[in-house]
């Protein structure tokens, strides 16, 4: 097998999640579960990938959210790969942005990094672990206020 164009398209984690979920549903509906070693390997890869991706923020994204995010990112001077990393990982700190944006110290001011963070956190939904952390911190705050 030969790769003709390695960078024909970049896929977000959301797109991979949707593709694999649809593929899994199609196989389930058609009832085709061949037990060849190649099919078993594909099933394993699909399962492991879906298991991993379902723990990331992309599980809570939609085509509208992705479109809105990419439209909002046009004002920022970032490469496609950098936008994709921001979309996939949903950074919440300046350090995370600096890790994802190449040469961020030279390319971005602190205000631009804060603007990026605001764009990311306001458009992209938080993952389940972020919601759990928020709920836990809310519970702690309520306990401190009401020591009944």
Swiss-Prot record:
Q: What are the UniProt keywords, alphabetically?
A: Antiviral defense, Cell membrane, DNA-directed RNA polymerase, Immunity, Innate immunity, Membrane, Nucleus, Transcription
The answer to whether keyword Lipoprotein applies is no
Q: Which GO terms describe its molecular function?
A: DNA-directed RNA polymerase activity; nucleotide binding
Q: Which InterPro entries match?
A: HRDC-like_sf, RNA_pol_Rpb4/RPC9_core, Rpb4/RPC9, Rpb4/RPC9_sf, RPC9
Q: What is the membrane topology here?
A: Peripheral membrane protein
Q: Name one Pfam family in it.
A: RNA_pol_Rpb4
**Compartment(s) of residence:** Nucleus; Cell membrane
GO CC terms, sorted: DNA polymerase III complex; plasma membrane; RNA polymerase III complex
Annotated region Disordered: the residues are 125-148
Biological processes, Gene Ontology terms: defense response to virus; innate immune response; transcription by RNA polymerase III; transcription initiation at RNA polymerase III promoter
Q: What is its main location?
A: nucleus
The protein's job, in short, is:
DNA-dependent RNA polymerase catalyzes the transcription of DNA into RNA using the four ribonucleoside triphosphates as substrates. Specific peripheric component of RNA polymerase III (Pol III) which synthesizes small non-coding RNAs including 5S rRNA, snRNAs, tRNAs and miRNAs from at least 500 distinct genomic loci. With POLR3H/RPC8 forms a mobile stalk that protrudes from Pol III core and functions primarily in transcription initiation. Pol III plays a key role in sensing and limiting infection by intracellular bacteria and DNA viruses.
How is the quaternary structure described?
Component of the RNA polymerase III complex consisting of 17 subunits: a ten-subunit horseshoe-shaped catalytic core composed of POLR3A/RPC1, POLR3B/RPC2, POLR1C/RPAC1, POLR1D/RPAC2, POLR3K/RPC10, POLR2E/RPABC1, POLR2F/RPABC2, POLR2H/RPABC3, POLR2K/RPABC4 and POLR2L/RPABC5; a mobile stalk composed of two subunits POLR3H/RPC8 and CRCP/RPC9, protruding from the core and functioning primarily in transcription initiation; and additional subunits homologous to general transcription factors of the RNA polymerase II machinery, POLR3C/RPC3-POLR3F/RPC6-POLR3G/RPC7 heterotrimer required for transcription initiation and POLR3D/RPC4-POLR3E/RPC5 heterodimer involved in both transcription initiation and termination.
Q: Which family does it belong to?
A: Belongs to the eukaryotic RPC9 RNA polymerase subunit family.
**Can you say what this protein is called?**
DNA-directed RNA polymerase III subunit RPC9
Species name: Bos taurus
């Amino acid at each position: 097998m030969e790769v003709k164009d390695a960078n024909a398209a970049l896929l977000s984690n959301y797109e991979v999640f949707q593709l694999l979920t649809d593929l899994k549903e199609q196989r389930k509906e058609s009832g085709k579960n061949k037990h060849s070693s190649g099919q078993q390997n594909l099933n394993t890869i699909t399962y492991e990938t879906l298991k991993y991706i379902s723990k990331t923020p992309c599980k809570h994204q939609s085509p509208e959210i992705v479109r809105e995010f990419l439209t909002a990112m046009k004002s920022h001077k970032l490469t496609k790969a950098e936008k994709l990393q921001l979309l996939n990982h949903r950074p919440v700190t300046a350090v995370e942005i600096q890790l994802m944006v190449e040469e961020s110290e030279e390319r971005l001011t602190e205000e631009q990094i804060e603007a990026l963070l605001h764009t990311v956190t306001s458009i992209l939904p938080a993952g389940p672990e972020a919601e759990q952390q928020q709920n836990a911190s809310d519970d702690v705050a309520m306990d401190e206020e009401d020591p009944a």
